[in-house]
Swiss-Prot record:
Transmembrane segments: 76-96
Pathway listed: Protein modification; protein glycosylation
Pfam families the record matches: Glyco_trans_1_4, Glyco_trans_4_4
GO cellular component, one term: endoplasmic reticulum
Cytoplasmic-facing ranges: 1-75
Name the UniProt record assigns to this protein: UDP-glycosyltransferase TURAN
Phenotypic effect of disruption: Pollen tube (PT) overgrowth inside the female gametophyte (FG) without PT rupture. Premature burst immediately after PT germination. Dwarf plants accumulating anthocyanins and dying prematurely in RNAi conditions. Impaired accumulation of ANX1 and ANX2 proteins.
Lumenal side: 97-465
Membrane topology field: Single-pass membrane protein
Covalent S-S links between cysteines: none
Function recorded in the entry: Required for pollen tube (PT) growth and integrity by affecting the stability of the pollen-specific ANX1 and ANX2 proteins. Involved in protein N-glycosylation in the endoplasmic reticulum (ER), especially in the female gametophyte. Mediates PT reception in synergids through protein glycosylation.
Residues modified by glycosylation: 238
Broad EC category: transferase
Amino acid sequence: MGKRGRACVVVLGDLGRSPRMQYHALSLARQASFQVDIVAYGGSIPHEAVLNHPSIHIHTMAQPRFIQYFPKILYPVTLLLKAFIQFTMLLWFLFVKVPAPDIFLVQNPPSVPTLIAVKWASSWRRAAFVVDWHNFGYTLLALSLGRNNLLVSLYRWSENHYGKMATGSLCVTKAMQHELDQNWGVRAKVLYDQPPEFFRPALLEERHELFCRVRKDLCHPIGVYDFISRELENQELNETLFTTKFNADISLKQNRPALVVSSTSWTPDENFGILLEAAVMYDRRVAARSKGSETAEISEEQHHYPNLLFIITGKGPEKEMYEEKIKRLNLRHVAFRTMWLAAEDYPLLLGSADLGVCLHTSSSGLDLPMKVVDMFGCGLPVCSVSYSCIQELVKDGKNGLLFSSSSELADQLLILFKGFPGNCDALMSLKAGAMETGSSGRWATEWEDCAKPLITQVVSQIADS
């Protein structure tokens, strides 16, 4: 495909935290037979499938970290200086360091200075220019500066102006496709996020090995000594919090805690406080019901509410603030752990969990959380914050539940985990729905049907011009 047989994927961010662009690179190499150059920042380690593919070449840019030490009063000046440094660096990589490609595929946002640099490079090197719209960059900037700020207006103009210059466009939802078409003059093709093949339910052996590997992370509570700490102190070598190994046989513990996973970027568009408030409500209600059940004539299995372990993955600016809040909660039936997992272990964690929680609300209201797609790939049902287009992904009552407040989330936790692990029909029903959703589509198929025809078209268009 193409005269040069080469594609360049541009991510002005941490490649390891940009899974969709990693999947694009893999598909360009596997399904379109391109040599693929990725220009991105370093930081987190990408998936081993990307690192080990002989046709994928990663070019790592250095981040202008010194800017973070500027005083906050100079924030607008800092933004402009950072954009100028990034622009200069991008021009060097895209004009000089990377071999000339047939196509540049760029993630948006960030829009400034990425779209300008890639547009210039595509014109200079006679390559197609495709934008993958994940969200709108100006809406993210507006979270910190406000919608009426002059810089936000300039950012939106630049995003619109250069976005319209693309040879082709992809986007993540039908709602975003409609917005781009009606208000931006951009004709985009929807490429839904779909889980790749390594997101699947974990085998018992994989669960046991995973929890052996993360035992050190689980041993360290956030602040107070909790039920997880007590349980781990008394464990035998052949057991984990969730599994027991006897000779070669591995089984799930009947008295295990329920495992709830949430992945967050610890940013203002994800209100983590909702989850903390719901955890407090669950803890208090379970404590009260446990006390009442001492005299009530109700079977233990029917009345049982498990302890909950929330494992929160991700990196971001508000992590320490929320960890301080967790330290002050002093919960008896709920525990929290924060961790950052290897790219190969994250799917195993999702495939071992009982429930996922998504707090993503979207700065634009037009994108969908990829973390939920990954959860469905692992057959994991999700409780998600409700917003304008989330119904394109989460079908309330079928593969997950939608909530708008912490009290709604607390109610959902009580409903889903009543009778856990053996007598929780509501949870099992959602799990079946999540399995069905996850198995109905995979990234390679979606990319072949939606992205590949567009890429073939724009590459041919440039080659013939």
